[in-house]
């Protein structure tokens, strides 16, 4: 019998085991589509970013003008720029839904995969932050000033650290050039970690909505899940296309149409929408160092989730009380996102503080306790 090159060639064999003959649980739902959508987002961002980098100039006197030049004079430059800007938003929508699915279905119990995923989230946030500075508009400049200044809260080394990142005594040309270098470099680091994420996932196999061992009920990845993923690709492309062509500035900030001016502070300094929940947590603590630590722990909290899992069941599928807590967390995060975009005044300060306490309580106290209670209820005869 003739051997199949797909199964024998050293390189094709790896691709075959990852994308063609990979045994996958038969019951994984559309919530498992977001991994492949994130890979598509990454590919789109790297391609559009590469073409933008060909025309962008990382200099404070030319950066803003070079972005205008891209939009006005470069063939389809406006389209490439809008895809890149809105693609970032879509990237975060997909990663937040991907994380939410992991929390709901207990995927965090695959510890190595989960931990690399959290590192990937940090890298994505860093990439988006330095990228937001590059157009050198008002919100780019002041957003960078506020966020980098937070590092000065660290005792003893804070001020030195801030000046080291700035490359001087204020945000200037050195800052912009290094941020451009980081923005170009970090996506390649994301690719490397994504491959590690895959590697560890394929060591254990995917989780499924029931949270049970699915070894006795596996189906090949191709054609079943390749077609399912392609449907996801089309849906996402349609959504991104509609956003880019009809509402390209919906998720941006109007302040960024004004060139950066160190002498004029915008009335409300705020980051992009996907950072607002963490920004609200930062602002809800009156102490600077406390706020910075709360900001860090709002994301680092995800690393603790596997150790706070007290339930005998893996997923939330058959746990109505924990389901209620999960959707409370989702609603709470949406409230934090809304608060992060509001001015620092009452009642927003108070709502933000309540939402921040609720956010940490749900992770650290309420969910583990309710899971323990559910175990007790299940053990009653």
Curated annotation (Swiss-Prot):
Gene Ontology cellular component annotations, sorted alphabetically: mitochondrial inner membrane; respiratory chain complex III
Tell me any Pfam family this protein matches.
Cytochrom_B_C
Q: Which residues cross the membrane?
A: 34-54, 78-99, 114-134, 179-199, 227-247, 289-309, 321-341, 348-368
Q: Which UniProt keywords apply?
A: Electron transport, Heme, Iron, Membrane, Metal-binding, Mitochondrion, Mitochondrion inner membrane, Respiratory chain, Transmembrane, Transmembrane helix, Transport, Ubiquinone
Cofactor(s) needed, names only, are:
heme b
Membrane topology recorded in Swiss-Prot or TrEMBL: Multi-pass membrane protein
> Which note does the record give on the cofactor?
Binds 2 heme b groups non-covalently.
Q: What does it do?
A: Component of the ubiquinol-cytochrome c reductase complex (complex III or cytochrome b-c1 complex) that is part of the mitochondrial respiratory chain. The b-c1 complex mediates electron transfer from ubiquinol to cytochrome c. Contributes to the generation of a proton gradient across the mitochondrial membrane that is then used for ATP synthesis.
Q: How does it assemble?
A: The cytochrome bc1 complex contains 3 respiratory subunits (MT-CYB, CYC1 and UQCRFS1), 2 core proteins (UQCRC1 and UQCRC2) and probably 6 low-molecular weight proteins.
Q: Other comments?
A: Heme 1 (or BL or b562) is low-potential and absorbs at about 562 nm, and heme 2 (or BH or b566) is high-potential and absorbs at about 566 nm.
Family statement drawn from the similarity comment of this UniProt entry: Belongs to the cytochrome b family.
Q: What is this protein called?
A: Cytochrome b
Q: Which organism is it from?
A: Heterodontus francisci
Underlying gene: mt-cyb
């Amino acid at each position: 019998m003739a051997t199949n090159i797909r199964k024998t060639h050293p390189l094709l064999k790896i691709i075959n085991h990852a994308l063609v003959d990979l045994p996958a649980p038969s019951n994984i739902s559309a919530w498992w589509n977001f991994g492949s959508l994130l890979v598509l987002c990454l590919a789109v961002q790297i391609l559009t970013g590469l073409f933008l980098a060909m025309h962008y100039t990382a200099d404070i006197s030319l950066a803003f003008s070079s972005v205008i030049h891209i939009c006005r004079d470069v063939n389809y430059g406006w389209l490439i720029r809008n895809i890149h800007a809105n693609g970032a938003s879509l990237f975060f929508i997909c990663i937040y839904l991907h994380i939410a699915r992991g929390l709901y279905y207990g995927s965090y119990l695959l510890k190595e995969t989960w931990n690399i995923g959290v590192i990937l989230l940090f890298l994505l946030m860093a990439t988006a932050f330095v990228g937001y500075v590059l157009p050198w508009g008002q919100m780019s400049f002041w957003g960078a000033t506020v966020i980098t200044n937070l590092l000065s809260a660290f005792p003893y080394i804070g001020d030195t650290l801030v000046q080291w990142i700035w490359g001087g005594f204020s945000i200037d040309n050195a800052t912009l050039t290094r941020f451009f270098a980081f923005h170009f470099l970090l996506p390649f680091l994301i690719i490397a970690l994504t491959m590690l994420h895959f590697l560890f996932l394929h060591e254990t196999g995917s989780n499924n909505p029931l949270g049970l061992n699915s070894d006795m009920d596996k189906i090949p990845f191709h054609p079943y899940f390749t077609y399912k993923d392609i449907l996801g690709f089309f849906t996402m492309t349609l959504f991104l296309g509609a956003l880019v062509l009809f509402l390209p500035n919906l998720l941006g900030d109007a302040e960024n149409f004004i060139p950066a001016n160190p002498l004029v502070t915008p009335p409300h300094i705020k980051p992009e929408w996907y950072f607002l929940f963490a920004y609200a947590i930062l602002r809800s603590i009156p102490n600077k160092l406390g706020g910075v630590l709360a900001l860090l722990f709002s994301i680092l909290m995800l690393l603790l989730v596997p150790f706070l899992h007290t339930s005998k069941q893996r997923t939330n599928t058959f746990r109505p009380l924990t389901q209620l807590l999960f959707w409370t967390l989702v609603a709470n995060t949406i409230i934090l996102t809304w608060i992060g975009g509001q001015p620092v005044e009452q009642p927003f300060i108070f709502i933000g503080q309540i939402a921040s306490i609720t956010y940490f309580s749900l992770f650290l106290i309420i969910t583990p306790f309710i899971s323990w209670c559910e175990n007790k209820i299940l053990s009653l005869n």
